């Protein structure tokens, strides 16, 4: 193979495939490299683009140093030695979102950008539902669902994008109508040097937006520099802010909806809803579609999702809580619950500091830990229970719970030490919880014979 490839795609998977599709539509045949021996998407690449070469098992520097542009997948750290060497040689290193931004650069602002440690998918979906209710021609994607470059294959008027810190590291020219950073808490500390480095990766989105929407109850989300900005929160708003007053969601002095009519549960989700309303407002969506969605949207799978109710015990799947902040938010959101909370927590902590959990463990009657970093979390609360598996954790929780209690899976950790992803973890919890009802019915049937 001749060493003449000017465009490299590093990392295959769904994002890498979308980059290849886009470049090939532009008449560019890239070279693809992946550090894995058998990367996901390899068969699809060969089927769709037999002319595109794939090198696996590492990044060959001979190709990197001759490239004019390298497009990296979000999972590849920009400080990977081979990538850093290319950057030091002034070779352009970008991501798929930056390619997307350049593709739409001649259009009027048509993007809503959403980042934050937690709640991104919920807010992105909510804004999408509001756009749908308003009859807009829209598309939702990015870190949720469809890769951004695949969204370009159909003409739309509004793009609603969930954006991770990894994606924002390589994005510089996204021209948003409005953008938000919902919250900041420790996450991906195995990739970032400290919380501030992670925060700055998130806040880079504000510099690429006409308006910044920050969380006034989380000072870490405030823009670094003065700009066209507004805020949201659960407190009473001032001037043009979004918030809550007398049990009602309000924009300034304008009432939008009563919290009593909102379908989604938990104070953290009410904050997510308010953020979505503010973003939708700046996209020209009026009050009625917001109200319609607020009354009907009950939440996403694996996010404080009620999966079973057995013997008056609620089993709630919050497997998407892959960091400490998400679990803190879940426990605070359920803070008004009258029964006990039995919490199942643990997994791969990604180098995070677990001590903030101590502040909310007073809301937890029984703590059950599992996974790689379960013991570190167990040390934060006396008389915790250790589980060897999810099945063991659910069994222990069922034995501890009484009528009116909640069994909450909110791990505060990634799932990769035990599962393929957080969805698989949540599905396992759901199946185990729902199986309890089958066992109960079987035992009752036997007793009646």
UniProtKB/Swiss-Prot annotation:
Keywords, ordered alphabetically: ATP-binding, Cell cycle, Cell division, Cell shape, Cell wall biogenesis/degradation, Cytoplasm, Ligase, Nucleotide-binding, Peptidoglycan synthesis
Main location: cytoplasm
Annotated compartments: Cytoplasm
GO cellular component: cytoplasm
Reactions this protein catalyses: UDP-N-acetyl-alpha-D-muramoyl-L-alanine + D-glutamate + ATP = UDP-N-acetyl-alpha-D-muramoyl-L-alanyl-D-glutamate + ADP + phosphate + H(+)
Pathways involved: Cell wall biogenesis; peptidoglycan biosynthesis
Family: Belongs to the MurCDEF family.
Role: Cell wall formation. Catalyzes the addition of glutamate to the nucleotide precursor UDP-N-acetylmuramoyl-L-alanine (UMA).
Protein name (database record): UDP-N-acetylmuramoylalanine--D-glutamate ligase
């Amino acid at each position: 193979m001749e060493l003449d490839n000017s465009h490299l795609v590093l990392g295959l998977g769904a994002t890498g495939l979308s980059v290849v599709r886009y470049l090939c539509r532009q008449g560019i045949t890239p070279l693809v490299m992946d550090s894995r021996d058998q990367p996901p998407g390899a068969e699809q690449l060969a089927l769709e683009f037999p002319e595109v070469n794939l090198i696996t098992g590492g990044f060959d520097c001979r190709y990197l140093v001759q490239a004019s542009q390298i497009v990296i997948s979000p999972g590849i750290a920009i400080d990977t030695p081979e990538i850093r060497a290319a950057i030091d040689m002034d070779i352009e290193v970008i991501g798929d979102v930056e390619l997307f931004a350049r593709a739409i650069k001649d259009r009027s602002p048509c993007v809503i950008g959403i980042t934050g440690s937690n709640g991104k998918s919920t807010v992105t979906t909510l804004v999408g539902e509001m756009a749908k209710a308003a009859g807009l021609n829209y598309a939702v994607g990015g870190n949720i669902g469809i890769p951004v470059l695949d969204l370009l294959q159909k003409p739309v008027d509004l793009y609603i994008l969930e954006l991770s810190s990894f994606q924002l590291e390589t994005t510089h020219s996204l021209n948003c109508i409005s953008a938000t950073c919902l919250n900041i808490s420790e996450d991906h500390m195995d990739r970032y040097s400290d919380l501030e480095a992670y925060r700055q990766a998130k806040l880079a989105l504000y510099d690429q937006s006409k308006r910044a929407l920050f969380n006034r109850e989380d000072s870490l989300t405030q823009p670094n520099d003065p700009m066209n900005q507004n805020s949201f929160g659960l407190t009473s708003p001032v001037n043009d802010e979004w918030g809550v007053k007398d049990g009602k969601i309000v924009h300034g002095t304008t009432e939008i909806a009563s919290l009593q009519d909102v379908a989604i549960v938990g104070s953290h989700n009410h904050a997510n809803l308010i953020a979505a309303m503010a973003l939708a407002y700046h996209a020209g969506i009026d009050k009625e579609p917001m109200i319609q969605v607020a009354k009907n949207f009950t939440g996403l799978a694996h996010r404080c999702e009620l999966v079973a109710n057995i013997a008056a015990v609620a089993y709630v799947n919050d497997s998407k809580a892959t960091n400490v902040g998400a679990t803190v938010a879940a426990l605070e959101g359920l803070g008004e619950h009258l029964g006990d909370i039995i919490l199942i927590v643990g997994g791969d902590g990604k180098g995070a500091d677990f001590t903030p959990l101590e502040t909310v463990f007073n809301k937890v009657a029984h703590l059950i830990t599992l996974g790689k970093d379960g013991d570190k979390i167990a040390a934060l609360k006396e008389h915790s229970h250790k589980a060897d598996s999810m099945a063991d954790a659910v069994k222990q929780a069922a034995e501890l719970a009484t009528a009116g209690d909640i069994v909450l899976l909110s791990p505060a950790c990634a799932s990769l030490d035990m599962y393929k992803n957080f969805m698989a973890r949540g599905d396992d919890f759901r199946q185990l919880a729902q199986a309890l009802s089958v066992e109960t019915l079987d035992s009752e049937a036997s007793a009646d014979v």
